Design a protein with these regions (language model features):
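Core segments of cupin and vicinal oxygen chelate
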Residues: 1-10
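Long C-terminal interaction/binding lobes of large macromolecular proteins
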Residues: 20
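Vicinal oxygen chelate
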Residues: 28-75, 79-122
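Amphipathic N-proximal alpha-helical interface segments
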Residues: 13-16
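Long, contiguous binding/interaction regions
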Residues: 24
Length: 122
């Protein structure tokens, strides 16, 4: 698993080895944690409960919350992603997926459904 960036955000795209070609989810970056919590409220009021979150990822140090949309596609709301200013020295780190860094807060347990949802790329 590795992250790619094309601007100052820590990551814009995550790529992982898989047995099938698929797009796991799309993330919508919002201005701050309060805005993310408001989006969670809007989704919950519309009948959508979180698949995973709210929480905070280790890589990127961003807050997150994942939902399944009406077409079973996974949507993420995220805020507070680390920014790496142009010209600033940055040392890449190895990230080994696990519960201790996937959600450093230890809240909003990931459901089995969250792990299984993906949309094949045609």
């Amino acid at each position: 698993f590795f992250f790619l960036r094309c601007n100052q955000q820590h990551h814009v795209l995550g790529v992982e080895n898989s047995d099938n070609s698929s797009l796991n989810h799309v993330a919508f970056h919002v201005e701050d944690l309060d805005a993310m919590m408001r989006r969670i409220g809007v989704m919950s009021n519309a009948g959508y409960e979180p698949l995973w979150g709210p929480g905070r990822h280790g890589p990127g140090d961003n807050c997150f919350c994942y939902f399944e949309g009406p077409d079973s596609f996974v949507l993420e709301f995220t805020s507070e992603l680390i920014e790496v200013p142009d010209g600033e020295e940055w040392t890449p780190k190895e990230w080994i997926p696990g519960p201790e860094n996937a959600n450093v807060w230890g809240t909003g347990g990931r459901t089995e459904k969250a792990a299984s949802l993906s949309v094949p790329i045609a």
